[in-house]
Amino acid sequence: MTTHERNEQLKIIHKHRNAIFSKGVKVLMVLIFTLSLFQSNPKEIVNAATPINFTGPELVGNPTNSSITINIVPDANIEYHYQYGTVSGTYPNQTANFTATANQPDEISIAGLVANTRYYYRMRYHAPGDGMDDWVVRDEHSFMTQRAPGETFVFTVTSDSHNASASNTGFVNAMNNINADHPDFHIDIGDTQFAEFTRNSSIQTNLNTAYKEYRATTHFGAFGHSTPVFLSTGNHEEEEGWNLDDSYSRGVANIQARKAFFPTPVEDGVFYTGNTDPLAAIDEATYGDELREDYYAWEWGDALFVVIDPFQYTMNLPYAPGTAGEENDDSQDGNQWSWTLVAEQFQWLKQTLENSDAKYKFMFSHNMLGGINRTVVGVGAGYVRGGAEAARYYEWGGKDAYEEDVFNDFRDPEDFGTKPIHQLMVENGVSAYFHGHDHQYVYELRDGIVYQEVPSPAMTGSGFSGIYTVGTYEDYETVAMCSNAGHLRITVSPEQATVVYVNSGSVTCTPSSFTRSYTIAPNTPVEGILGDVNGDGNSNSSDALIVLSGDAGMDISSFCPINCGDVNSDSLVNSTDALAILSFDAGLTVPFPLGSAGCPASITQPAGCNP
């Protein structure tokens, strides 16, 4: 087979990051562009087979069941290709040759791969025009394609590294610890590249520099060659909606830097779902599209992963101007209801949770929406602090500061429905929500859902005080709190998910007996008899009447949740299920196992469960 034929079979896609590009391209061709994204100032002249430095070494991203994306930033002009295969040291496949420009990001996607498979790859490069038999060979790395259900795998999580430097020992240790964990992928939930540090500048290249620093081997480059990195923005990346209309917006610059240096998922109609709403402020002529790359979801093994964005659609400033390093050009409205996903993202989240039957469902964002109702360390409540306690309020939980259920007073039911985020999480079997922002480790439970505050890998101490206290409360529990620094390692197996706090510095916990580890059970069929919603052991007309009443909005809360009423497993309990129960009670044959043990693990409860 010729190289051309192999490339066509493997559907290799090349997208230059130093030129116009479009993410999510699904065409069977090589796309090569030559327009420059950044000024080219080669640091050295490369002769044949002369090694060079890479400001951005190989970074893998956007893994799917059949493809991987690799991004590099070389310090000199090069011609290069990748060799790869499924056995270490053996590379039966080779991409076409591509050219990359000095100091500019360059990215290719390799498709046609096999799911649930580890691939080994290496780059070979030389100066453009050098002999085709003379190459510099870089180290071998590897990556996984999508795990199959039932396969055990590891992923890792960090938050709030706050533009850590290479001299930060705890941070560097954390990066090396992540590499030692060999995760299938890593999720970082923000306050990382820290747009605030470029406050006195109005130049895109300063944000680019911050992102390139995180490509170093002291940072995400320690593991990014073999571990895809998923980014979720934090408040200090300044992508809040009220910042995106500035004459020079660091939020927009942050989006553009992320698009250039870190492959991030977009809606592709096949593997990833996500935001399709364009942002006109993004320089389409340079970056190829106006996609925000802010929220997205995918499945891997037995788990669903959902990254949400509380920032870009929050248009009014709820706290004192300048608190997070923004400009002082926006006035404070002081309203915690201002924090929102907006209807489109809210409905996307709802549908994503409802449409998945994964054993585990994990959600991620830097902070919640609304937060607790008190000032923390001199900063007003609008700055959004807290986890399980905060899940009671505003768009997340539906209550206001006066403990009144007023969700639909502030959210149009035609756009948002009648249930706030936490209720959607409960009804759809969310296993855990990982959040940052408060600079400490906190393990909490609310309605069986883990609320996990992620520690910083770069800080020391116990974070902000006045937010969390270990104890059991009326509707949630704060199980344990620990100081920084480190990361989370989550091992997902069919039997359980194990969450471990891997420390990279000295850590103390409350209670002191806490082992920095806990497990999460998978979503399993609910115990009970299918069709029996009143708990009497039978599936009959009494149950059908309860289902019909709940579907009509009548109060049936004393029987809720009524997962056993979803007899046709469509995630709803309605008149269709009632008819099936009545037919079964009358002795008619129905295509559902009514009267058998086991009920759906997660459903949308009928209106009568929340009258």
Where are these regions (language model features)?
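An anionic, turn-rich surface loop/hairpin at beta-sheet edges
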Residues: 467-477
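C-terminal segment of classical bacterial N-terminal signal peptides
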Residues: 35-45
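Cellulosome-associated attachment modules in secreted, modular CAZymes
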Residues: 39, 526-611
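Generic short N-terminal amphipathic or hydrophobic helices
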Residues: 11-12, 19, 31, 44, ...
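N-terminal secretory signal peptides that target proteins for export/translocation
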Residues: 1-21
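Sec-dependent N-terminal signal peptides
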Residues: 18-37
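Metal-dependent phosphoester/phosphodiester hydrolase catalytic core
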Residues: 49-465, 481, 489-527
